[in-house]
Curated annotation (Swiss-Prot):
One of its GO terms (biological process) is positive regulation of canonical NF-kappaB signal transduction. Residues 105-138 are annotated as: Disordered. The keyword Cell wall biogenesis/degradation does not apply. The gene is Lurap1. Pfam families: LURAP (PF14854). This is Leucine rich adaptor protein 1. It comes from Mus musculus (Mouse).
Length: 239
């Protein structure tokens, strides 16, 4: 039996000579066991222990499997490290892009707020910030005569109250020469008419005394004053 097993074992001397090392006994025993299993016609059950393998062979097989698993673990770890580096690179790119996008959006929003919402109005932004002068134009269009009309009644009411005398206006500079002469003649005739109405001769039985103003004279004076004021107002408006 032993002779048949040794004869079926392959000759490994050439391999030992080329490698320079002796073939391990475990490998030889494994080869011998395979040969015995191939020659014997006995069928072993899956759970039954093999007769040709000892405890040392099982330990060696377990060590080889552990080394193989460790090599696989090392490869998996290397792949995981490479994958982690790629993920970190992509994450950094996304963060930088988000930062640049937010910065650009903030700059764009500030530019739009300064330009008033449209790039075309950027050149006119300074002009839009200037105050509106339309109100001053409206004030300039108001005539001086209407302004005097609003101020005159209040001033006339205040003339009856005691207070400092108002400065007199040099009407000679305001009223033209012809109108001024006509106004003086009319006022002189009005005064003469009032004096004629109040003063009478001594033969009429009336005592001479200071003239008393009549109602007609007061009405005429009021009319003349009103006409005089209207003429002045027209002249000022014309100027």
């Amino acid at each position: 039996m032993e002779g048949t097993a040794e004869s079926q074992t392959p000759d490994l001397r050439d391999v030992e000579g080329k490698v320079g090392r002796k073939i391990p006994e475990g490998l030889l025993r494994g080869l011998r066991g395979e040969c015995e299993l191939g020659t014997s016609g006995d069928v072993l059950l899956p759970g039954a222990p093999s007769t040709g393998h000892g405890l040392g062979d099982k330990i060696m097989a377990l060590r080889m499997e552990l080394a193989y698993l460790r090599a696989i673990d090392v490869k998996i770890l290397q792949q995981l490290v490479t994958l982690n580096e790629g993920i970190e690179a992509v994450r950094w790119l996304l963060e930088e892009r988000g930062t640049l996008t937010s910065h650009c959006s903030s700059l764009t929003s500030s530019q739009y707020s300064l330009t008033g919402g449209s790039p075309g109005r950027s050149r006119r932004g300074s002009w839009d910030s200037l105050p509106d002068t339309s109100s001053t134009d409206r004030l300039d269009s108001v005539s001086i005569g209407s302004f005097l009309d609003t101020v005159t009644p209040r001033e006339l009411d205040e003339q009856g109250l005691p207070g400092p005398s108002c400065p007199e206006i040099d009407w000679a500079k305001v009223i033209p020469t012809e109108d001024r002469a006509r106004t003086e003649v009319d006022m002189t005739s009005t005064k003469l008419g009032s004096l004629t109405a109040t003063w009478k001769l001594p033969g009429d039985g009336l005592q001479c005394g200071p003239p008393e103003p009549s109602e007609d004279g007061n009405a005429n004076q009021g009319f003349e004053a009103h006409w005089y004021w209207g003429q002045c107002q027209d002249d000022v408006t014309f100027l």
